[in-house]
Amino acid sequence: MRAVIQRVKAAKVTVLDELVSSIGPGLCVLVGIKASDTAKDVEYLVRKILALRLFEEEGKRWQKSVKDLNLELLCVSQFTLYHRLKGNKPDFLAAMKGEEAQELYNQFLDRLGQSYDSTKIKDGKFGAYMQVHIENDGPVTINLESPEQKDTDREVDK
């Protein structure tokens, strides 16, 4: 599971010119799910995202997390994070397919809400063609990826 995390002053998602979600200061999180991801990957990303110290305190950088400062998160599913180039054309065979990915993505959103504050967690519209408007702060962009699990670990998850 991958996440591209951007510190933002504001962010919003629209679909067909309709506002779906918006946040003020906080994090915009683009989330990619690969075919072999499980609940363990969800737990890892949720824990890391909420603990990342990307915000200042009293002029000192990298001191506070989104949770410490009670800020919002805007999460957007993005299967293109699991691409591979064939020449100049991307393919997305490594990405988890539709319904299964949506289930794991919803699990990710639920766990964020359970581990933090569900009213602070916003998201786009899964599977829709979205416009994501991000007002970067810094800019600060962090890439996270859950560690590969051994095959024996995956068998336990099934």
From Swiss-Prot:
GO BP, sorted A to Z: tRNA metabolic process
Residue ranges of the motif Gly-cisPro motif, important for rejection of L-amino acids: 138-139
Main localization, broad class: cytoplasm
EC id: 3.1.1.96
GO MF annotation terms: D-tyrosyl-tRNA(Tyr) deacylase activity; Gly-tRNA(Ala) deacylase activity; tRNA binding
Keywords annotated in UniProt: Cytoplasm, Hydrolase, RNA-binding, tRNA-binding
Gene3D superfamilies: D-tyrosyl-tRNA(Tyr) deacylase
Any one cellular-component term (Gene Ontology): cytoplasm
Catalyzed reaction equations: glycyl-tRNA(Ala) + H2O = tRNA(Ala) + glycine + H(+); a D-aminoacyl-tRNA + H2O = a tRNA + a D-alpha-amino acid + H(+)
Location relative to the cell: Cytoplasm
EC top class, as a word: hydrolase
Family named by the database record: Belongs to the DTD family.
Function: An aminoacyl-tRNA editing enzyme that deacylates mischarged D-aminoacyl-tRNAs. Hydrolyzes correctly charged, achiral, glycyl-tRNA(Gly). Deacylates mischarged endogenous and E.coli glycyl-tRNA(Ala), protecting cells against glycine mischarging by AlaRS. Acts via tRNA-based rather than protein-based catalysis; rejects L-amino acids rather than detecting D-amino acids in the active site.
Cross-referenced PANTHER family: D-AMINOACYL-TRNA DEACYLASE 1, D-TYROSYL-TRNA TYR DEACYLASE
Subunit structure of this chain's protein: Homodimer.
Entry note about domains: A Gly-cisPro motif from one monomer fits into the active site of the other monomer to allow specific chiral rejection of L-amino acids.
The protein's name in its UniProt record: D-aminoacyl-tRNA deacylase
Source species of the chain: Drosophila melanogaster
